[in-house]
Amino acid sequence: MRIESLLQHDVVERILERLAVNSLPRFKAVSKQWKSTIESQFFQGKHLTHRQQSGDPVVLMVTVYNDDSPHVGSLLLGSRRTRNPTTLII
């Protein structure tokens, strides 16, 4: 199953806002929608504002329940201060 079908796009945007600028180019290859989002002026403004106003959340957790199977996916993002900042289980 593709990640775009597991996560709503607004959740994806919130996650992308919290990533370092130098990591964003590789996420443009995930899908046309992600590429379009990352390249939009609106997203770039939100990303810059987020970086200026906060030091990232300690943890952002998204859990996805899929009706087609009992599989549950989780995405955990830590702040820049955590030792193991990203865990993706989907």
Curated annotation (Swiss-Prot):
Disulfide-linked positions: none
Domain of life: Eukaryota
Domain spans labelled F-box: 1-46
Name of this chain's protein: Putative F-box protein At5g16285
Annotated organism of origin: Arabidopsis thaliana
